[in-house]
Regions:
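Interdomain hinge/linker segments and adjacent boundary elements that couple functional modules
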Residues: 1-15, 19, 25-29, 43, ...
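Positions that flank functional sites
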Residues: 32, 72, 207
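Tryptophan-centered motif/residue detector
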Residues: 33, 82-83, 216
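C-terminal regulatory/effector modules of DNA-binding transcriptional regulators
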Residues: 177-277
Length: 277
């Protein structure tokens, strides 16, 4: 899955070519590239180096200020994100998208989402959830990566809006024992006070609802031209949904869950009660 910057750059390259009235075959022939390379650059499947972008802009007749803007975007798309230090334990495509998101919607019917987990709570989940036999060092490595992810919600520059909907069972499911669970609830209480974080609880009394099919995450971006992405993971691995119809269904589902859930104020009170039990 291309990063947001890569998708944005790909869209600009595609639009410039079309504005120039050129086919992919024509551009490929002029540059001595394959048509497949042009196609991959225009979908973000392959990274476009600033050098390649400059060559394409020459052919398309793109001049400043658009030229400078797109070349700067190409350079930014090549920059290493913090997650590149954890590629051995993290899904780089997901964290790259998460890092660029302006809004993260997380339906969490089983456990507290990773962005809000305490280290001890996260360690218990990492240990219990591994089908492979990982040693302590590998588990700690994954834990470090998860804690590093959390810095996006506290950063001073453009932190995303995080909207979490928890199933009520998450508040009482013992992960690692009473003390770890209690500390996690206290952490949730603190996080609900951040202006960019909203936590709602879906009461057990809600009965049958659209979220019973499983957890999912919605990622929305600041620029309207950047389409939303939905994400889910499990034993099957990870699944990214970019098809507009499917993403719309996820958006509708999240909105229905939001309407069914307790208000943020009622939810905070319920979490505080769970923290004291």
């Amino acid at each position: 899955v291309p990063s947001v910057r890569a998708r944005r750059l790909a869209r600009w390259l595609r639009d410039f070519r079309r504005r120039a009235g050129l086919s992919q075959d024509t551009v490929a022939a002029r540059l001595g590239w394959s048509q497949g390379k042009i196609g991959h650059l225009e979908t973000g499947r392959n990274k476009a180096s600033p050098h390649d972008v400059a060559l394409m802009l020459d052919i398309y007749g793109v001049v400043t200020p658009e030229r400078e803007m797109v070349l700067e975007l190409a350079e930014r798309a090549e920059q290493r994100g913090w997650w590149t230090d954890y590629t051995d334990v993290l899904s780089s495509p997901y964290v790259a998208l998460e890092d660029e998101a302006s809004m993260i919607g997380d339906w969490a019917p089983q456990v507290v989402p990773g962005l809000l987990q305490t280290p001890d709570y996260a360690r218990e989940l990492l240990t219990a959830g591994m089908l492979d036999n990982l040693d302590d060092r590998e588990i700690e490595r994954r834990l470090q990566a998860r804690m590093a992810r959390q810095t996006i919600i506290t950063r001073t520059e453009n932190p995303p809006e995080l909207h979490v909907i928890l199933d009520e069972s998450v508040l009482t499911r013992q992960i690692g024992g009473p003390e770890i669970q209690r500390d996690q609830m206290h952490r949730l209480v603190r996080e609900t006070r951040r202006p960019n974080i909203t936590v709602q609880v879906l009461s057990a009394s809600a009965g049958a609802h659209i979220g019973l099919d499983g957890a999912f995450i919605l990622l929305r971006f600041a620029e309207e031209a950047d389409p939303d992405v939905a994400y889910t993971e499990g034993f099957h691995g990870v699944v990214y949904l970019e098809n507009p119809h499917l993403v719309t269904r996820c958006n509708v589902a999240f909105e229905r869950l939001r309407e069914l859930a307790l208000s943020p104020e009622e939810s905070a009170a319920l979490i505080e009660t769970a923290a004291e039990e």
